[in-house]
């Protein structure tokens, strides 16, 4: 999709009034190429749902649920597409539900940290380095600013 241009967001304490932070957040992300995206996160859902990523465009759609590819369809098929559909492309993990944040396991985070440590030991660059990670953090900060101010927040952020 490319770089993010701006973010508009809303957060609330929909269900868990006893916690110190929001339990529902929705953001609309505008990319520099004009595409729009939606990011939603919640621990206020019943009965508690697993992670879900949807990517849709004029030439195809991908749907990932619980870290497994459920749909992989493109207008123009490539040889690798059938292989991805057959193997589902991703290892499946039991990820717990969004209803109880304590059920969300740490396995994927642990693997990511181990990979970074191994790259440092071997003098390699991690697949996602600190510069790329900062971009994700910048988007998260923009989402919080947008939800707090009610304004559309443009990126890159200024101090």
For every predicted segment, state its role.
Residues 1-36, 42-48, 131:
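Rossmann-like dinucleotide-binding domain that binds NAD(P)(H)
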Residues 26, 31, 54, 58-131, ...:
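C-terminal glycine/acidic-rich active-site capping loop/insertion
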Residues 139-149:
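Short arginine-rich
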């Amino acid at each position: 999709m490319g770089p993010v241009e701006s973010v508009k967001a809303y957060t609330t304490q929909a269900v868990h009034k006893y916690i110190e932070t929001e339990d529902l957040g929705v953001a609309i992300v505008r990319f520099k190429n004009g595409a729009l995206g939606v990011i939603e996160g919640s621990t206020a859902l019943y009965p508690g749902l697993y992670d879900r990523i949807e990517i849709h465009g004029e030439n195809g759609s991908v749907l990932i649920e619980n870290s497994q590819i459920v749909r992989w369809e493109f207008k123009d098929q490539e040889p690798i597409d059938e292989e991805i559909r057959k193997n589902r492309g991703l290892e499946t993990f039991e990820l717990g539900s969004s209803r109880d944040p304590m059920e969300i396991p740490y396995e994927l985070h642990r693997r990511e940290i181990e990979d970074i440590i191994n790259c440092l030991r071997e003098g390699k660059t991690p697949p996602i380095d600190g510069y790329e990670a900062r971009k994700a953090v910048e988007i998260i900060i923009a989402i919080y600013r947008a939800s707090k101010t009610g304004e559309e927040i443009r990126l890159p952020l200024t101090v």
